[in-house]
């Protein structure tokens, strides 16, 4: 999973965001910020994992941001994030080629259904990882 020495950000408050946030925390990956369309919905999650809540446009540009949003929302959320920010999204059905050109864009897709209500460890969950460069792909592994 993503390098534990560098903080990350998460966008989203649904099933995948919640499960990944706790998995990252349990793997000692620091989540510095969590953002969502409405900041009210992420306050409890952010507090649980020790993250700050921010607007999508305010996400740090120097760390990986994981988009845990619906497939349809990915293009519009990407437009709100600084184009230099490294981003990975959690959809297996949205092609990298269909999205805006960015230096660091990737897919970080868990090959298992995740739900907020069911606590689980992700150590045995396979992830599909793809990126627009080999260098960035290696950062997501």
Feature-to-residue mapping (PLM):
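Rossmann-like NAD(P)-binding element
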Residues: 57-79
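Short loop/helix-cap segments at secondary-structure boundaries that form the rim of catalytic
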Residues: 43-47, 59-61, 78-83, 95-103, ...
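NAD(P)+-binding Rossmann beta1-loop-alpha1 motif at the extreme N-terminus of oxidoreductases
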Residues: 1-55
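Rossmann-fold dinucleotide-binding core
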Residues: 89-141
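Hydrophobic Val/Ile/Leu positions in short beta-strands of Rossmann-like dinucleotide-binding domains
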Residues: 9-10, 67, 129
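Conserved beta-strand scaffold positions in the cores of enzyme catalytic domains, especially
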Residues: 34, 53, 87, 105-107
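Short, flexible coil/linker segments at domain boundaries that flank nucleotide/cofactor-interacting
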Residues: 2-3, 60, 122
């Amino acid at each position: 999973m993503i390098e534990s020495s560098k903080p990350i950000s998460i966008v989203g408050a649904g099933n995948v965001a919640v499960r990944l946030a706790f998995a990252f925390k349990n793997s000692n990956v620091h989540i510095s910020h969590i953002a969502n369309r409405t900041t009210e919905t992420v306050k409890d999650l952010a507090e649980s994992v020790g993250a700050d809540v921010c607007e999508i446009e305010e996400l740090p540009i120097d760390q990986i941001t994981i988009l845990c949003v619906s497939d349809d929302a990915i293009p519009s959320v990407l437009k709100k994030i600084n184009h230099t920010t490294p981003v990975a999204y959690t959809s297996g059905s949205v092609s990298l080629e269909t999205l805006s050109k960015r230096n660091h864009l990737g897919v970080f897709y868990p090959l298992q259904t995740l739900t907020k209500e069911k606590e689980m460890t992700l150590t045995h969950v396979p992830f599909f990882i793809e990126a627009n460069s080999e260098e960035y792909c290696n950062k997501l592994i």
